[in-house]
Amino acid sequence: MAAKAGAGVLTGTGRNAAAPAPGSATGRTLTVAHDGSAAHRSVQAAIDAAAAGDTVLVSRGTYHETIDVPAAKRGLTLKGATGNPEDVVITYDNAAGTAKPGGGRYGTAGSATATFSANDVTVTGVTIQNTWERSAHPDVKDTQAVALNASGDRQKYVDSRFIAHQDTVLNWAPHATAQYRQYFRHCFVAGDVDFVFGNATAVYDHVNITLRDRGAAAGGNNGYLAAPNTDSAKPYGILITDSTVDSAARAGTFYLGRPWHPGPDAVGRLVIRNTVLPAAVKTGAPWTDMGGFSWKSAHFAEYANTGPGAGGGANRPQLTAAQATTHTARSYLAGTDGWNPTL
């Protein structure tokens, strides 16, 4: 996205020591261990060797690499072997403004530690992080540093962690008006600026979200949780439901979101409901403009949120009970084929 910022290592998970969800694979299992005790030493080597429907099973360890699952690897499952995402870490440190070896810059999407372009992908029991830090690169202007680039349909991310600073998770629809759905359950997501963003339909269900402190004084600006750029033709954008947001930042220093408006058809849709919000949220006005585009022109709403960061008033649009029945994980993800990963 437009100018933003970097990453680091945190602890935390959506559900401690949880067993991984069943994968959707029907083919082989390819094993990975960086000590050479498995068939492959790197995660990408196993992905390259995998066919559609295979499972890549990753042993405990830290893997310093970028990974890319192309569209042809439909139905691939990436699974941490222990079931605890803190044990299996895939990490890298590119930013949008990082120079590429062959010339040019990576750009926002290209900065991702992990890119999943295939449909029907399942990711479970891993940590994916981008450790690029603003403070270490004061000369870099484009500070977006993506951990996860999710750009396929019917993708599931379960019991996993996604950690960066700016633009942690990109929920992307390569064809803006087409159907791209991504489901996150029992995950942990951390960042500071626009760190859940994009134009896909994405549901964050029973996740833990950490707003990372950038050191702003009370009442200042530490950052923004979300920045959707949903196409105007789509009924649903990003939904955060039944989740917990926490932060060590000072009170009133974080916005819940702002509308990313890269083109005339991007309006931004975001609903946060039944979620615990921390004191770090700007309770009087949690939404803000972006690039001259008013948040009031987007579709931002809340419903039944709790915690010290919850509130009401003219600057906090609320769904009615009737409207809330259409803003559920099921309704967002059903699409034209009735997909229901919540079962």
Model segments located where?
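N-terminal low-complexity, Pro/Thr-rich disordered segments
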Residues: M1-T31
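Sequence-level preference for short, compositionally simple segments enriched
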Residues: T26-L343
